[in-house]
From Swiss-Prot, chain A:
Role, per record: Component of the origin recognition complex (ORC) that binds origins of replication. DNA-binding is ATP-dependent. The specific DNA sequences that define origins of replication have not been identified yet. ORC is required to assemble the pre-replication complex necessary to initiate DNA replication.
GO cellular component: nuclear origin of replication recognition complex
Induction: Regulated by E2F. Accumulates rapidly after cell cycle reactivation by sucrose addition following cell cycle arrest mediated by sucrose deprivation.
Subcellular localization(s) per the UniProt record: Nucleus
GO molecular function, one term: ATP binding
Organism field: Arabidopsis thaliana
InterPro entries per record: ATPase_AAA_core, ORC4, ORC4_C, P-loop_NTPase
Keyword entries, A-Z: ATP-binding, DNA replication, DNA-binding, Nucleotide-binding, Nucleus
Protein name: Origin of replication complex subunit 4
Family annotation (PANTHER family): ORIGIN RECOGNITION COMPLEX SUBUNIT 4
Swiss-Prot record, chain B:
Induction line: Regulated by E2F. Accumulates rapidly after cell cycle reactivation by sucrose addition following cell cycle arrest mediated by sucrose deprivation.
Intervals of motif Nuclear localization signal: 83-90
Disulfide bonds: none
Taxonomic path: Eukaryota, Viridiplantae, Streptophyta, Embryophyta, Tracheophyta
UniProt function note: Essential protein required for ovules fertilization. Component of the origin recognition complex (ORC) that binds origins of replication. It has a role in both chromosomal replication and mating type transcriptional silencing. Binds to the ARS consensus sequence (ACS) of origins of replication. H3K4me3 effector that positively regulates the transcription of a subset of genes.
Biased composition (Low complexity): 27-41
All copies of domain BAH, residue ranges: 226-344
Region Necessary and sufficient for ORC complex assembly: start-end pairs: 436-803
Binding site for Mg(2+): D561, E562
Pfam family, one: PHD
Protein name: Origin of replication complex subunit 1B
Biased composition range(s): Basic residues: 43-52
């Protein structure tokens, strides 16, 4: 083992950047109209002016809601180190009201070095939270409640939301309640009492534009000149990146990627795949790396399942399809075997197998989720008597069979008629 | 209300004062004699001093010759010396000079000498005490809650005779009837005419003398204060001694008299000057600022010198003619954790209603065992922090161990030094947490509630009754009831209404509906029990008429907010609560608040019949009322255009009539204006304009799904178009992924787009389902997955019709 090569160091550097949300979203938040500026302004207003606020961050998954909030809260923690404490809840973990109140009390105790008691009841915890809000308000401290997966808190009686928002309007406190949700109708889920107390500040996180993504691409992949890399390598690497961005084929690759998903998270995954495939000998990214990354991003698992079937499994799939064409919407293994026998008798195929071999092939198809049970009831029945459904469509089956290596020609003929 | 301190100089007795004090400490059983007037003074001199002091206490400017009172002076943190009558009484100067003691900044040495001795004495003997609310001592009245000067050491008595109430001018060293002005930096007093150049009027705002001004500008040349003439000693007022650490200030917490020896004691809560805290004097501290601590001590009343006046910031701003003994106290300092907290203003907090009815008693005999226990607790908390045996901070309701640890190590600078702009004042007053002084637009409803309650509890025949109050959220139901209860409490103190006890419960803050029994019982009796035991006790009280103490004879008013959450499967909770007022001698009045108008009709017949016919409806606010509500809050603050307020009022009145929503829109508009003015600092208009209100409304009522649909990926748009197309083709809202994929395939084939594949298309559909643009089953169903639009198809058509990248989408919509 020798010293780390510049290629490996650059690979680690770029991977570290891709996994750092603040590095990714800092340039996207530079504008004064951005959600980051608005968020930071509202929370800092709560800190400096001693008031309460509540807001809701909405956007598709992967658009940077939690990352931008962490960026803003991190900046405010640096600016006001003694005046801010953050309480984080997640709807997947704390959607139960008792659990949520206990978690808030626990985090408040940890933040202020108090002793937490697990035996406290719902009443004790809720009164404690109100007392802490009052004490922090008198001490000019702001508590930021981050409710991730906000729509999960909006189920049931919504006691947590009501208590937090009601405490913010009746107690002299400084608190900010931030809800984060990928459901765009999250505010419609609120009960009418909670909705009245919520301030309905909604910040929408939309995918960035092409220019912003191009700038982000260069920002993520350019090597800094003042680092420990050899200067010749840095200039070669950065020139390669610049040439890539102006290449027409690269633009087509990005266009295909963004046609399906244009969020930042998808873009980061794509770059991560490409960087992981970088040639460690030359230490440079090439167009082939991005092509391979696009292929891995655009996989079709159901199609690959059909392509990897055996010939007998293909026969069974064709038989199911023919049964559906005959308006027989539900079938089981016995019906499929009848159809298989009929095909054999009509066309005298040379590939005829016994029933137990066919049953094993049938179960193999179900394990790969090409077919599934039609209903969940009647589990006491044997496998061959339960109703089945074909999950792939006719065109998918057709496409898979055409790309199969050793598909008999008779099957294609059988599928068409 | 803080009154002008009644000042009186402590007169010297015939004997040596140190002898008397030493004697009283060594043998507390001996009776302390009232000090006598020294016989050496002539009657004429004593009479002249008495007359002079009487006039000075009045602060009457009419008696000042040749000085017209200045009308309409708006003084901020300015204390003008009232003109005083000249006195010919000259105090003879002492030949001995008292050494100035060193400042003691450590907390450990803060405890004064006197209280330690008194505590030691008190520990050894348990004595009977007579507690007072008011005591006259040395011809001065002292009351619980008063602020006083306290001696620091025994031998500080020698300075006592020299205490002038009137400060000398720092330039001519005379105190006369002319108006003086105080420097805000060195707190020195100056005659207006002694200044260079002389002032004709007291200027508004802050004022610094020329000596401090030169010092602050950092010039190498220092302008020295004039020195006093020879033979005249510069007299220090008590305020100066306190701020330099030679005296203490304290608040009287308790007053009592030992029965055996007749010695008067007080329980003192100490004040601290900023220099004595761990953080020292911080840059934003005012010269006259003190901190209230949580340090207590028992001292004899003879250690008290006289009154001073410690005020909260609002009263401090108005105190312009209150003399030299005025101080500011805004923060509380915890001597154990060395942290600061803002003092909770007493006007905000609601005091316990049970304590109010006790009223003020002249004297009360109390057992000293309880007092000793309290002292032990205080001493224990002085020595160390909390022990883990006490349990967690959140383990018991109403007693949170360690909450006092929550405090600032340093008071942040932006809180004290920041001057609020008009926009910030508007934002503060538009907060939902800000309580308005008056409640506009609900006078009729409040009168109805008042007459209902008064009719229920008047005289001695308390009728058990119920009232159901309903209305949509944000129409002022709860705040109206609380405002009525506050007014009634004031009337109880005046004596025109008989006392009652008031319990307020919120249905959404209970762990379960049955928990309401425990909460009611705890509020009435102070005991914590399970809900079954509580139900039994409440049944005994209300249904069977059993009463234990004298407190139970009072009527009980029960306010249940969010009443509809108490509905259980068999509705037994509501039945019990509404059945109790129908019993004779229950003396229970129930006020229920909920949002639904038809809640009684939904309940069981035997419950709705007990709820009675007393209904009160709070309708949604119309735009005139909303405008009045907002304008009342913004009274005196010039931050909004009138059209902006009207625009917000009309918008909210058209949608919901919710006062909370209207206030939030105006506050959000003020935030938008603040953000706009911060980024564009050259703007001349500082008001909230209509565009800001429009931006706030746009943000609050926006449809985010349309914006998201406009910005989704290309294939997502094609997917949505295919769904709309399927809807029109089949007429059914629900479709399957198989059909949508087939439609997408044909659309892509027709318009030259590459079909992505079924699996990628399935993922696109699941992503749209996660945003709830469409509703979909889990993706594992693949071809059989059921899909449905979550928003109207017109919204999809509106969002996708004008797309630039895909102009042909309009053909399918």
């Amino acid at each position: 083992m020798g010293k780390e090569t510049p290629a490996e160091k650059s690979l680690n550097l770029i991977r570290g950047r891709l996994c750092d949300p603040s590095y990714v979203f800092r340039p996207l938040s530079a504008s004064s109209d951005s959600n980051y500026s608005k968020l930071k302004f509202i929370v800092s207003t709560s800190i400096t002016e001693g008031c309460n606020n509540s807001m809701l961050l909405l956007g598709p998954r992967g658009s940077g809601k939690a990352a931008v909030l962490d960026l803003g809260v991190g900046d405010l923690l640096e600016q006001f180190p003694d005046s801010v404490s953050v309480i984080r809840l997640n709807g997947l973990l704390h959607s139960d009201d008792n659990c949520a109140f206990k978690e808030i009390a626990k985090q408040l105790c940890m933040e202020h070095h108090l002793l937490f008691s697990k035996m406290a009841s719902f009443d004790d915890n809720s009164q404690f939270i109100i007392a802490m809000l009052r004490a922090c308000g008198l001490a000019h401290k702001t508590i930021i409640f981050v409710l991730d997966e906000f729509d999960m808190f909006a189920q049931g009686k919504q006691r947590l939301l009501y208590s937090l928002l009601d405490a913010m309007q009746s107690v002299t406190s400084q608190a900010v309640v931030v809800g984060i949700s990928s459901r765009l109708d999250a505010d419609q889920l609120l009960e009418k009492r909670v909705r009245s107390r919520f301030s309905h500040r909604k910040f929408l996180f939309l995918p960035p534009s092409r220019e912003e993504l191009d700038g982000l691409f260069v920002h993520l992949l350019s090597l800094p000149a003042d680092s420990g890399f050899p200067s010749g390598y840095v200039s070669r690497f950065n020139d390669k990146i610049k040439n890539l961005t102006s290449d027409t084929r690269f633009k087509d690759i990005l266009k295909t990627l963004f046609n399906a998903n244009s969020t930042v998270n998808s873009f980061l995954k794509f770059i991560f795949c490409a960087v992981s495939l970088m040639n460690l000998e030359s230490g440079l990214l090439s167009l082939e790396n991005f092509k391979a990354a696009l292929s891995s991003m655009q996989r079709q698992p159901k199609l690959e399942a059909v392509r990897d079937c055996s010939v007998l499994e293909l026969y069974l799939l064709v038989c199911m399809r023919r049964l559906e064409v005959k308006e027989q919407s539900s079938y089981n293994f016995i019906s499929v075997m009848k159809e298989y026998k009929a095909i054999h008798d009509s066309f005298h195929t040379s590939d005829y197998y016994a029933q137990n071999v066919c049953l094993r092939a049938f179960e193999h198809l179900r394990e790969r989720q090409v077919i599934c049970y039609a209903e969940n009831r009647g589990q006491s029945q044997t496998g061959e008597y339960r109703l089945q459904k074909l999950l792939i469509s006719a065109s998918e089956l057709h496409q898979g069979m055409r790309s199969h290596a050793c598909c008999p020609a008779i099957l294609l003929k059988l599928l068409d008629h | 209300m803080a009154s002008t301190p009644r000042a009186k100089t402590f007169k010297s007795p015939t004997k040596t004062p140190s002898n008397i004090y030493r004697k009283s400490y060594l043998s507390p059983s001996s009776t302390s004699h009232t000090p006598q007037t020294p016989e050496t003074h002539t009657p004429l001199r004593r009479s002249a001093r008495h007359v002079s002091r009487k006039i000075d206490l009045g602060n009457d400017p009419i008696d000042a010759p040749g000085n017209d009172p200045i009308e309409g002076m708006n003084l901020i943190r300015k204390r003008e010396r009232a003109p005083r009558k000249p006195t010919t009484d000259v105090v003879p100067s002492k030949s001995k000079k008292t050494e100035t003691p060193k400042k003691k900044k450590k907390i450990d040495s803060f405890t004064p000498v006197s209280p330690i001795r008194s505590e030691t004495i008190k520990k050894t003997k348990k004595k009977k005490r007579v507690y007072y609310n008011k005591v006259e001592f040395d011809e001065t009245e002292f009351e619980i809650g008063d602020d006083v000067y306290v001696k620091r050491r025994e031998d500080s008595n020698s300075d006592e005779e020299e205490d002038p109430e009137i400060e000398d001018c720092q330039i001519c060293f005379k105190s006369d009837t002319n108006i003086m002005i105080e420097c805000d930096d060195c707190l020195g007093g100056f005659h207006l005419k002694c200044l260079k150049p002389p002032l004709k009027e007291v200027p508004e705002g802050d004022w610094i003398c020329q000596f401090c001004e030169v010092k602050k500008s950092g010039q190498s040349q220092t302008l020295d204060l004039p020195k006093p003439p020879e033979g005249k000693k510069l007299a220090r007022t008590m305020r100066e001694k306190l701020l330099s650490g030679d005296l203490w200030a304290a608040r009287i917490d308790k007053l009592w008299k030992e029965v055996d020896d007749g010695v008067y004691w007080i329980r003192a809560r100490w004040y601290m000057i900023p220099e004595e805290t761990v953080s020292g004097r911080q840059p934003h501290n005012l010269k006259r600022e003190l901190y209230l601590t949580n340090d207590f001590a028992d001292i004899e009343m003879e250690c008290i010198l006289r009154h001073c006046s410690v005020k909260c910031p609002k009263e401090f701003s108005k105190a312009s003619n209150d003399g030299d003994d005025v101080f500011l106290c805004e923060y509380e300092y915890d001597v154990h954790w060395r942290s600061f907290k803002r003092l909770a203003e007493l006007a905000d907090g609601d005091s316990d209603s049970d304590q109010e009815w006790n009223g003020r008693k002249e004297e009360e005999v109390d057992d000293s065992d309880e007092e000793m226990e309290l002292d032990d607790e205080v001493l224990k908390s002085k020595r160390g922090g909390l022990t883990s045996a006490r349990g967690g901070a959140n383990s018991r309701k109403g007693r949170f161990f360690g909450v006092e640890k929550v405090g600032m190590k340093l008071i942040p600078e932006h809180v004290r030094c920041h001057k609020q702009s008009e926009l910030e004042k508007a934002k503060a007053t538009l907060l939902l947490a800000t309580r308005p002084k008056s409640l506009p637009c609900r006078s009729k409803e409040m009168e109805e509630i008042t007459s209902f309650i008064k009719g229920s509890i008047s005289d001695d025949q308390c009728l058990g009754r119920c009232m159901y109050i309903h209305g949509v959220p944000g129409t002022g139901k709860t705040i109206s009831v609380l405002s009525v209860m506050k007014n009634l409490k004031a009337e109880v103190e005046e004596g025109s209404v008989s006392p009652y006890c008031f319990v307020e419960i919120n249905g959404l803050k209970l762990a379960s509906p049955e928990n309401i029994y425990s909460v009611i019982y705890e509020a009435l009796s102070g005991h914590r029990v399970g809900w079954k035991k509580a139900l039994q006790c409440l049944n005994e009280r209300f249904a069977e008429g059993k009463r234990i103490g004298k407190e139970d004879e009072k009527p009980c008013i029960l306010l249940i907010d969010e009443l509809d959450l108490l509905v259980t499967r068999n509705q037994s909770v509501l039945y019990n609560i509404l059945d109790w007022p129908t019993k004779p001698n229950s003396k229970l009045v129930v006020l229920g608040i909920a949002n639904t108008m038809d809640l009684p009709e939904k309940l069981l017949p035997r419950i709705s019949s007990r709820m009675g016919i007393q209904r009160l409806c709070f309708g949604p606010y119309n735009h005139t009322q909303l405008q009045e509500i907002i304008s009342t809050r913004l009274n005196g603050i010039d931050a909004f255009e009138k059209t902006a307020i009207e625009f917000a009022s009309r918008k909210v009145a058209a949608i919901s009539g919710d006062a909370r929503r209207a206030l939030e829109i105006c506050r959000r508009a003020a935030e938008v204006a603040d953000h706009r003015l911060n980024t564009n600092k050259s703007a001349k208009n500082q008001l909230v304009i209509m565009a800001d209100v429009e931006a706030a409304i746009q943000e609050m009522f926006q449809a985010p799904h349309i914006q998201v649909m406009k910005s989704v990926s290309k294939l997502s748009k094609i997917f949505l178009t295919a769904m709309v197309h399927e809807l029109y083709k089949t007429g059914m809202a629900e479709t399957t992924f198989d059909r949508v994929a087939t439609t997408v395939s044909s659309i892509c084939l027709t318009n030259g787009e590459a079909f992505p594949g079924w699996d990628i298309l399935l993922k696109i559909g699941c992503d749209l389902g996660e945003c709830r643009i469409i509703l979909c089953e889990p993706g594992e169903k693949h071809r059989l997955q059921k899909l449905q639009l979550n928003f109207p198809s017109d919204d999809v058509a509106f969002a996708l019709k004008d797309n630039k990248d895909l102009p042909w989408l309009a053909n399918y919509l």
